[in-house]
Design a protein with these regions (language model features):
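Short terminal alpha-helical segments
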Residues: 1-36
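Alpha-helical rod/repeat scaffolding segments in eukaryotic adaptors/tethers
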Residues: 2, 27-41, 55, 59-66, ...
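Charged, amphipathic alpha-helical oligomerization/scaffolding segments
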Residues: 8-19, 43, 47-50, 72, ...
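A structural signal for well-ordered alpha-helices, especially hydrophobic packing surfaces
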Residues: 16-24, 52-56, 74-84
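Functionally constrained cores in energy, signaling, and assembly domains
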Residues: 48, 55, 96
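Amphipathic alpha-helical binding modules
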Residues: 65-96
Length: 96
């Protein structure tokens, strides 16, 4: 991928990230509320955008940043994908 395309994607992702984060912050739902699932979906989208930015950032791919992104995505996804124990896989990223 050339630098122009990479920079365009990153610029669009920053806009998408700002909109997603603002929507998340405006959602006042708490665990157990009817809107909780929607708030968690917004958080998952936010983390997916962080993964995109980590993946396309200039230089070497940061293993620590990638682990952090995947940990968050797996942890949040665990509540949407049942019977696969994604949280266990997330925790395994940081176990010896």
């Amino acid at each position: 991928m050339d630098d122009t395309v990479r920079n365009d994607i990153l610029a669009m992702s920053r806009t998408a990230h700002s909109l997603t984060e603002a929507s998340y912050q405006q959602n006042m739902a708490k665990r157990g509320d009817a809107g909780w699932s929607e708030k968690q979906r917004l958080l998952l989208a936010d983390m997916a955008l962080h993964l995109l930015q980590t993946s396309l950032k200039d230089g070497e791919l940061s293993e620590e940043a990638l682990k952090r992104n995947l940990f968050s995505i797996l942890t949040i996804s665990d509540q949407f994908i049942h019977d696969h124990d994604l949280k266990r896989f997330a925790d395994a990223l940081y176990s010896p």
